[in-house]
């Protein structure tokens, strides 16, 4: 890609990815909804709100005009919360031309249908551009500080996957390519729900054994769903599956894990969310419940998280429901 990469979404994750691409020497245009904040980034060369200790490399140019960004860039990467994903697509739809290719680094599911974000794109954009999704074990603050990170890019077009990987790849940010959009999307979405579950177990003081069991059984649940939806089950043993799951379930930088910890300690759900901020797993739990039900896939850990967040069981009841389940055959 000789033209700049357009990153749409200037939160912590969008800014971190812009920094990574900048360190890779690739020109970037970075847009955010808050025009004043984007102008401040252009002036101060730092995102003071989200990544105050991570200066922007020279190739990164904040752009407050979305129309100008889309006109200048052939390749676009959406990095917005899942709740804003569809509305952002509708904003982009009249601006996208045949030359454009569209990727996203949003982790979650469609709020309207419980389906994959790729299905939202297929519903909104006509004709459909080449698509890609970037996912993997990656906290924004660590990427922004240049700490070693590895992620996966899955795309409908191998050329797009390679170009997007090249835009980000440098010695501190490794990018692997895939063709499995379904598996990569599921890994990034389901892990947020499972991180709440492992946080609850740790908040209750259940220990390392229980945490390991939840991670392992949670991976099996994700694998069952991915197979039902036509994904490659091996994707879930890679960065976008197991890698992201382990990171999110074991490190307190994860907001989803921190919410689980709070619930395990007996704190109020609404108060915990208000204190932590946006917790993607809260929305995803309900969406995942619908997706698994439609696919006819049993996901007991994710189901208990859904029931707890919906207020239909207490934290203690959710845990007991899992502990009282009969044992079965070990699944791959």
UniProtKB/Swiss-Prot annotation:
Record flagged with keyword Cytoplasm: yes
UniProt pathway annotation: Membrane lipid metabolism; glycerophospholipid metabolism
Annotated positions binding sn-glycerol 3-phosphate: 107, 136, 138, 191, 244, 254-256
Enzyme class of the recorded protein, top EC level: oxidoreductase
Positions that bind NADPH: 13, 33, 107, 140, 255, 280
Keywords for this protein: Cytoplasm, Lipid biosynthesis, Lipid metabolism, NAD, NADP, Nucleotide-binding, Oxidoreductase, Phospholipid biosynthesis, Phospholipid metabolism
UniProt entry tagged with the keyword Glycoprotein: no
PROSITE patterns named in the record: NAD_G3PDH
Main location class: cytoplasm
GO cellular component labels: cytosol
NCBIfam families, A to Z: PRK00094.1-2, PRK00094.1-4
PANTHER family per record: GLYCEROL-3-PHOSPHATE DEHYDROGENASE, GLYCEROL-3-PHOSPHATE DEHYDROGENASE [NAD(+)] 2, CHLOROPLASTIC
HAMAP family the record matches: NAD_Glyc3P_dehydrog (MF_00394)
Entry's family note: Belongs to the NAD-dependent glycerol-3-phosphate dehydrogenase family.
Protein's UniProt name: Glycerol-3-phosphate dehydrogenase [NAD(P)+]
Organism lineage: Bacteria, Pseudomonadati, Pseudomonadota, Gammaproteobacteria, Chromatiales
